[in-house]
Amino acid sequence: VEDVIFKNNTVNGVVVNWTPVLREGMHVDPLNILAKIVVDGTGHDSEIAATVARKNGIRLATETGGVIGERSLDVVAGEDEVVNGTKEIYPGLYVCGMAASAVSGTPRMGPIFGGMLMSGKKVADEIIAKLKK
């Protein structure tokens, strides 16, 4: 994902390109993929959330309005807080997993991954509930 589709102050999809095009510097238009919901599960860099905030001058649902950045490792706190940070951070954009930790400024978690599974389940459940409305 190199960008998002942003219309009416809502994230409406993603803009993607493929590696050979980028590697060879080919002048090929990227693909636009429309979506009712976009999930940033890009990990420690939270690339989609960072792009949305940077390019559109908006405030995310965080203490600072931007991507706070993950804190140093604390396995116990990280396991709980990755689930708590899993949420919709801007209309049409959810975060889960380590992207949720990076966006919310919570600790990374180390080698125990129960929180990652619970984060994935939570984001799926929230999206299903939203789409049913």
Language-model-detected regions and their locations in the chain:
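Residues forming the flavin
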Residues: 1-133
